[in-house]
Amino acid sequence: MPTWADLSSSALLPHFKLLWGFHHNPAANEYTGLIAGGHVSEWLGANFWGARLQDIHPPHVVTEARRFFDHILTAPAAGRCSGRLFTMGGKPVTGERIALPLAPDGTHPGGILGATDYAYVPVSGAVELIHENVEWFAI
């Protein structure tokens, strides 16, 4: 399984605006923001880097995100969502999201690299994640 160090910054750079990532601390059972591309930065600003999942989203969203992330790490599997990805200011935003496990030691999953592509909606307001039309791909 790839590690963060295996990722080529030159290969990822053209897609950086789509990327996001979390580190998982199994002892604390916490996910911490690690990579925030342009799209995530637009919603959350500097609040993503180093922030715990529960500090970024409301409790009901955290529960669903944890379920999604936990499956990625424990299966391990790649996850794909399509259709409604989130709401912004109550308006649905559609697109596609993928999330892949990463292993700090090359063997045991402990991080997630994701990419989200969507049609930009010029609205503002609270952002709430949606995991719709989820597909799993065993790794």
Give the residues covered by each predicted segment.
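Intrinsically disordered, low-complexity terminal regulatory regions
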Residues: 1-47, 51-55, 63-139
